[in-house]
């Protein structure tokens, strides 16, 4: 299984600086925009469904809204699951926004949570895991911790700097 780390640079994070008024809003908007672009890329290039995991419900809800209006020329079909009642039926959309890793999921996972996914080599594994790291120190440290966790499990790790 492949784990891809997308490391967003300072220059990338500043692209939307004129659209919002505070630095934290710039960062949040830049991350949401990147997640939308990455989601569209995954849908275009993969036959697998995508699960986006985040333990911050407010960010999942903001992403839900952003995905509906992200690109006027395309549509990203998705669903937001706000409860922990994960069923195959609820995971039937091409993109699912959820707070925890669903059991027996074998598609692509975009992990926005602060910790690495608890993956077992004995169970069903996702095809690929995507991790996003922002330039702030907290995110960098979380990224290092995730990298070590996945490396120690023997997964293939790929690094993509985004500027």
PLM-predicted stretches and their roles:
Residues 1-31:
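Glycine-rich phosphate-binding "P-loop"
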Residues 31-88:
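Short, well-structured hydrophobic secondary-structure segments
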């Amino acid at each position: 299984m492949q784990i891809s780390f997308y490391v967003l640079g300072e220059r990338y994070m500043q692209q939307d600086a004129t659209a919002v008024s505070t630095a934290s809003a710039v960062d949040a908007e830049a991350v949401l925009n990147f997640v939308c672009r990455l989601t569209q890329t995954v849908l275009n290039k993969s036959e697998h469904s995508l699960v986006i995991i985040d333990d911050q419900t407010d960010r999942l809800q903001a992403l839900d809204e952003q995905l509906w209006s992200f690109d006027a020329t395309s549509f990203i079909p998705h669903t937001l699951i706000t409860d922990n009642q994960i069923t195959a039926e609820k995971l039937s959309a091409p993109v699912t926004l959820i707070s925890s890793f669903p059991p027996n999921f074998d598609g692509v996972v975009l992990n926005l949570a602060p910790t690495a996914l608890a993956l077992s080599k004995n169970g069903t594994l996702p095809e690929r895991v995507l991790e996003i790291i922002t330039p702030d120190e907290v995110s960098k440290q979380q990224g290092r911790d995730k990298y070590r966790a996945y490396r120690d499990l023997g997964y293939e790790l790929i690094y993509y700097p985004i500027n």
